[in-house]
């Protein structure tokens, strides 16, 4: 299936749901930001696995429910805490540990394994009866032959962040290395501010869009006999169709 098909389907699912999607992203971002400034390093790692992990899983689950037209609410963001909390913490820990261990060997194998494990949390949502390792194994099996496609899909979002990131970098360089020149310092400051504002604005749009696209990718590749678990999606018809009741 084409990259554009996944992205078109994601936009279709978000149609009329942008408000709740952006609101959930804001809440997720605020909570994650608070957890990201701990008093010490050990507290950071504890909070990351006990709170950030289930929160991230709930954020993915929200978008999976979104593409299935289940009208998810803010409470879905916290479903990683209310549904199999300990399993979700352990799953987040294991996926991150496995990925880090592969990254310690080489960057490329680490990226490949990260792609292989990327469907784990979606699988845990659809199949709560499976163990963590079964979900990881199922994700690896599902991504067999699909990793390149997902990698290209992820790369297609990069242009959105390149320009604001470049403005931020240029601004920082100008501020720190040309402080003696008031004109260049002013240019650097303006560039930094514009880059930060653009980055925030783009993130508000991009994160719900990206995560919804990831959910579409999963739902389009999950092997299931239950039609309610997958969208009606083809290259010829890239719009998700809301099921009739």
Name the predicted role of every residue range:
Residues 1-245:
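Hydrophobic alpha-helical membrane segments
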